[in-house]
């Protein structure tokens, strides 16, 4: 795979080329994902649940993201790599800059932060320093206690308008990519069509520019109740490689997520 850059991803949006992304946490899987053609990987704070066994992302520390970012970058030298800033690691500009430096130096191309209007100054300060920022709105897992659980956001008119406003405000502040999580498909469509930056969806329908899934969900190895937007790509494919190929193809063709996996 040739090196994936933010310019290339922006061109995909411009040319209406859909793309697949996946979470990755270690060398072996990231190497396999890159070999099979996954262009974008996220070292997500979801590792708190999938790797560390917690019941939320809240216990994850910046050291954890740093460690896993290094491992993923070794396995996937050419993929575009996002890394989360975990809970309370960006509560001040000074703390954000310090922690962002650690993650970028570990191999990430871009950092991802959760939240809306309150992040405007943070995004501006990072952008001034030529640091690529991905926003994350809708269901924000770091706010799980405030949101009273993992549930769809933006169903009510006022909440939908708030999410739309946040998307535009964050783009104006300088984010270069946006993740929409667990919002209605038509709301995600409206946001995607009206932003100039690439929009990646998870549980937000098929109208976004790209899709992302947690690797354990995609491979059907997550315990507990299966989320509506999760599809097991491994069960009928016989190998992880074939599962990844099917995922990429279904996203590119606009077949995933179908209505069955959307809100």
From Swiss-Prot:
Pathway: Cofactor biosynthesis; (R)-pantothenate biosynthesis; (R)-pantoate from 3-methyl-2-oxobutanoate: step 1/2
Disulfide bonding pattern of the chain: none
Annotated binding of 3-methyl-2-oxobutanoate, by residue: 45-46, 84, 112
Cofactor(s) needed: Mg(2+)
Any GO CC annotation of this UniProt entry: cytoplasm
Molecular function via GO: 3-methyl-2-oxobutanoate hydroxymethyltransferase activity; magnesium ion binding
Catalytic reactions of this protein: 3-methyl-2-oxobutanoate + (6R)-5,10-methylene-5,6,7,8-tetrahydrofolate + H2O = 2-dehydropantoate + (6S)-5,6,7,8-tetrahydrofolate
Enzyme class: transferase
GO biological process: pantothenate biosynthetic process
Record carries keyword Magnesium: yes
Compartments where located: Cytoplasm
Keywords from the named record: Cytoplasm, Magnesium, Metal-binding, Pantothenate biosynthesis, Transferase
Function: Catalyzes the reversible reaction in which hydroxymethyl group from 5,10-methylenetetrahydrofolate is transferred onto alpha-ketoisovalerate to form ketopantoate.
Family: Belongs to the PanB family.
NCBIfam families for this protein: panB, PRK00311.1
Protein name (Swiss-Prot/TrEMBL): 3-methyl-2-oxobutanoate hydroxymethyltransferase
Source organism: Buchnera aphidicola subsp. Schizaphis graminum (strain Sg)
